[in-house]
Structure formats: C-alpha cells, structure tokens
Amino acid sequence: MGSNVEFHDFSVKVMGEIDDRVNIVLEECAGELESQIKRNSRVDTGKTKNSFRHHVDDDAHVAYIGSPDENAIWEEFGTGEYAINGDGRKGGWVYYDEKGERHFTIGKKPSRAMWNAYSRMKNMIIRRIQDFMKGL
C-alpha cells in the first residue's frame, strides 16, 4: 500500500518571477512619480525640472528619484525667510542670475514638487503594486 510522492522544487523559479515583477512595477511607479514631480516643478529655464531622474536598483528592489541640480533642494525646501523650517537667512541678499543681472531677494518660497507628488500619488502607487503582485 505504498504511495509514491514526488516533490518538485519550484522555489527558484517563483522567487525569480517575484523579483522580475517587483522590478517591473517599481520602474513603472518611479517613472510615474518622476513625471508628476516634473509637472509640479516651477519653470524658469527648465533646467531643474528636466534634471529629475529615477533609477531602480534591481538587486535591492529600491527606486530612487531625485535631481543632481542644487536648485532642486532650494525649490523643495525654500530659502531665506521662506525656508520651510524657518532656518533660512534673514534680511535678504543680492545675487546675479545666469544673464549677469543683479537681484535682491529675501528668499525663494518652497514649491514642494517632490513632497506634493509623493502625497498625491502614494495611495495610488501602493494600490498599483498590490494589484500588480496579485497576478502571481
């Protein structure tokens, strides 16, 4: 009365499929978030807006979104008397723009392009990842 039981280990295949799907949905969501950040950005020359990029680390399953442009920090958090934490320079200062023109300012109001994009899209991204992973 013996029965033959045969065991097949598909764990490597399953884990590979999970890895692939995670990276696909991360790429999709990071791209959407990058696009929303760009739509939220103030535009003068377009340099800062166009500097935002995303990168997915396939091994770590992490998406990075940001800008190497120093102005992106100032746009996000503000400067001078408008700095988001109130810790900016007070009293104003003079600067020269790219055309060499002189300006006086008390700071730059924060645009919060990244924060607003994240706040707007967070729940949608969570739902998208959940729905995408259900298909396994």
Where would I find each of the regions flagged by the language model?
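Small/polar-residue-rich segments within soluble enzyme cores
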Residues: 79
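His/Glu-rich zincin catalytic helix
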Residues: 74-76
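Short, Lys/Arg-rich flexible segments
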Residues: 1-72, 85-136
